[in-house]
């Protein structure tokens, strides 16, 4: 029963974990794939490259706004860029390095991403994301774990032991951040999935509650409520 629910959770919210096409050894020599790779690099490189050098906050500008809400969000902007970027590129990185030009590019970004991840949890790093400073660390952890679950060999497998321990501690610290009765249940559930996969100790009831709640919130035609009420936003795909 437990493993069936985990499978359902991954199938719903991490489809690429279960269905990634086996394209190892494929070079980026056709037009569509070449454009796709170029787009990945264009989007991901500013985040991954700068974080790997401990210069993300220094080099990447953030939008300014006079609104109080936007000003508060400036604090978490850099952190949010990391989890989402890694969740996006992880399936590609998990293909691993090979002798093609694309495989060599992957090797470069695997090493860069692992260094970036290490910096993000190093208290001595300028780009350290303090796990107790904001509830948004729960959201970022969920997206980051989504990426790590999709690249367990190339990302988690290549992280140093100290960084792994720091991530586990950071994820456990988010348990004090109680989610609202909405899409945030998925974030807490994803953290527990990460702890199960990489830490061994997890809370099954958190995952079950998220699945049961979203099943009850189904509105039809592939759309889920963000809570009991209908609310169409990009979290439907998450």
Where are the regions that the model predicts?
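Positively charged n-region of N-terminal signal peptides that target proteins for export
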Residues: 1-5
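Intrinsically disordered, low-complexity regions enriched in Ser/Pro/Gly/Gln/His and often acidic
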Residues: 6-8, 29, 85
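Solvent-exposed, well-ordered amphipathic alpha-helical segments
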Residues: 17-21, 165-168
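Low-complexity, Ser/Thr/Pro/Gly-enriched N-terminal "stalk/linker" regions
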Residues: 24-80, 87, 91, 111-116
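Aromatic-lined, polymer-binding surfaces characteristic
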Residues: 78, 89-92, 102, 106-238
């Amino acid at each position: 029963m437990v493993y069936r629910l985990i499978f359902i959770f991954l199938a719903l919210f991490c489809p690429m974990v279960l269905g990634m096409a086996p394209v190892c050894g494929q070079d980026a020599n056709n037009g569509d794939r070449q454009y796709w790779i170029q787009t990945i690099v264009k989007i991901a490189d500013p985040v991954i490259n700068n974080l790997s050098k401990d210069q993300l906050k220094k080099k990447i500008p953030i939008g300014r706004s006079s609104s109080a809400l936007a000003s508060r969000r400036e604090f978490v902007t850099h952190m949010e860029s990391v989890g989402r970027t890694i969740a996006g590129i992880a399936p590609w990185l998990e293909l691993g390095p090979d002798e093609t030009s694309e495989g060599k590019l992957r090797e470069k970004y695997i090493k860069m991403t692992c260094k970036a991840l290490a910096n993000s949890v190093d208290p001595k790093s300028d780009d350290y994301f303090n796990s107790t400073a904001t509830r948004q660390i729960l959201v970022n952890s969920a997206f980051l774990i989504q990426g790590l679950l999709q690249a367990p060999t190339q990302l988690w497998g290549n992280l140093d032991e100290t960084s792994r321990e720091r991530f586990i501690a950071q994820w456990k610290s988010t348990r004090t951040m109680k989610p609202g009765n909405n899409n945030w249940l998925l974030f807490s559930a994803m953290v527990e999935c990460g702890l199960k996969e990489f830490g061994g100790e997890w809370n099954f009831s958190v995952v079950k509650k998220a699945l049961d709640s979203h099943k009850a919130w189904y509105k039809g035609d592939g759309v889920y409520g963000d809570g009991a009420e209908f609310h169409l936003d990009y979290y439907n795909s998450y």
